[in-house]
Amino acid sequence: MAGAKEIRSKIGSVQNTQKITKAMEMVAASKMRKSQERMAASRPYAETMRKVIGHIALGNLEYKHPYLDERDVKRVGYLVVSTDRGLCGGLNINLFKRVLADMKAWADKGVESDLAIIGSKGLSFFSSVGGNVVAQASGMGDKPALSDLIGPVKVMLQAYDEGRIDKLYIVSNKFINTMSQSPQIVQLLPLPPADDAEGVVKKSTWDYLYEPDPKALLDTLLRRYVESQVYQGVVENLASEQAARMVAMKAATDNGGNLIKELQLVYNKARQASITQELTEIVSGASAV
């Protein structure tokens, strides 16, 4: 059994670590609330934009934009949103497993994949497993701006425009609540119909009026749509990251408390054994006299 002094030193080390994890938990909780506010502010715009684009995809357009046309799939692209920092539980690895599973499903059909990575953790992982990373962005901090994401988005849109990829997906964590975040894969291109758009179009033959003309409007609008969906994915992933980190740090703090209790019991036993030995030596010495 370890000596009382050594055990006392271990207890002190665990207590110091516990203070750090508790502080990190509180910081993550504060950042999560701010991320939730940012996510809530951008979500209505992203959802409305998606609904409008869904109606356009089912409408009777004079000009059929390439982003609305299905085509034979020879190669797919993924915009993968990960984190720049760790200590957030299984948030990243669960997302990466989802991407790999989807890539394998396409590979079984003879379709290859390109990756544009947002976040250093994703870049590190997919570089290590041999993924074809064609663009990356990292170091966006706690307040990501759309300008930080333009690089990877532009690369993937250009690849789609030139026919080098035939489908484009965004992969990110959807924030459900503080305790639950779920990896999701959402198709960006070609534009999928909105969830309720098909039923609306079946009941009515209405369409939008375009000014000055459909091509000029759609060329800009559809790119803004993709950018808005990517930005929304990033802010939701950031909220998910902070929530996962808060939960992970709370678990670490609680585990530290349990470990301290166990070490305290061991320390008490060691101290008791030491006292018993000292008493035995005193009694033995007295008997010898």
Swiss-Prot record:
Membrane topology: Peripheral membrane protein
Any single biological process term in GO: proton motive force-driven plasma membrane ATP synthesis
UniProtKB keywords: ATP synthesis, Cell inner membrane, Cell membrane, CF(1), Hydrogen ion transport, Ion transport, Membrane, Transport
Single GO term (MF): ATP binding
Subcellular location per the Swiss-Prot or TrEMBL entry: Cell inner membrane
One Pfam family per UniProt: ATP-synt
PANTHER family given in the database record: ATP SYNTHASE GAMMA CHAIN, ATP SYNTHASE SUBUNIT GAMMA, MITOCHONDRIAL
Family the entry assigns: Belongs to the ATPase gamma chain family.
Function: Produces ATP from ADP in the presence of a proton gradient across the membrane. The gamma chain is believed to be important in regulating ATPase activity and the flow of protons through the CF(0) complex.
Protein's name according to its UniProt entry: ATP synthase gamma chain
Gene name as annotated: atpG
